[in-house]
Amino acid sequence: MKKLSLFLIIISIISCKTVEVNQQRQQTTKTVVELGVIGKITKGIEINTFQTTTVPVYKQKIRVSADILAFDDNTFNTYAQAALQQNKKIKITYIDSVANKPGYANLQILDKVQVLDELNAPHNTGVNTYLQNATNNVLITGLSAYFDAIELSNISQAEEVYLINNKPKKYSLELVKSGKPFAIVDISKSVPFTYTTASFCWKKERGKISIANLTYKSETCARETYKNVAKLNKKINYYKY
């Protein structure tokens, strides 16, 4: 009986830290999380906390997928806790028995190659150097957030969505329709309540260290690439012996 109770407690704690969004388990957050930033996750008993450590410069816009999803009980409760903690005064009327439920946006970075190019570019040398010397940093690759009705409507009409760095250390969404931008959405005005992350895999070519790839969840780095930069400098050349 004690083992069963302990098991149920563990399952309850895990379920509080994640919630299913679009058939994907995502980390829950009560604090503000921004798409495209880099930071560290501090594990807690009830919830993990993400803290931003560095904000990369994206000179090129990054393609993003944007799905408008309807709240269910789990996602709405997660949102409500986040809105309270973030002191965001955005009111939503949610009734479980009503078929037409309010929606939110699920954003995911699509263009991983563009992100890698940007992180390895000269304008992000400081970010790159920091990441080489600081462990356990992750990139925010996706988030679920509530935007006001007008912005949600604009996002739903967009044929293409891009993450843009239109102000210093500030990201927005550029919405495109018929090949032309028609709206800019300020992400900071939303209420994020879940997020996804990716870790960095590093390589060394001709003496230069750079980010080779981004890995998700339990994925491992490809051959000759490592999550720990120190391993690149500890490789032994056995041909010397």
Locate predicted features:
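Membrane pore-forming effector domains from diverse proteins
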Residues: 53, 91-158, 174-239
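Bacterial N-terminal signal peptides
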Residues: 5-13
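An N-terminally focused, membrane-permeabilizing/fusogenic/translocator signature enriched
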Residues: 2-3, 15-103, 221-241
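Edge/loop elements at the starts and ends of beta-strands within beta-rich repeat scaffolds
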Residues: 164-168
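Short aromatic-glycine motifs in intrinsically disordered, low-complexity regions
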Residues: 160-162
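Residue-level marker of positions within ordered structural domains that often coincide
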Residues: 6, 21, 178-180
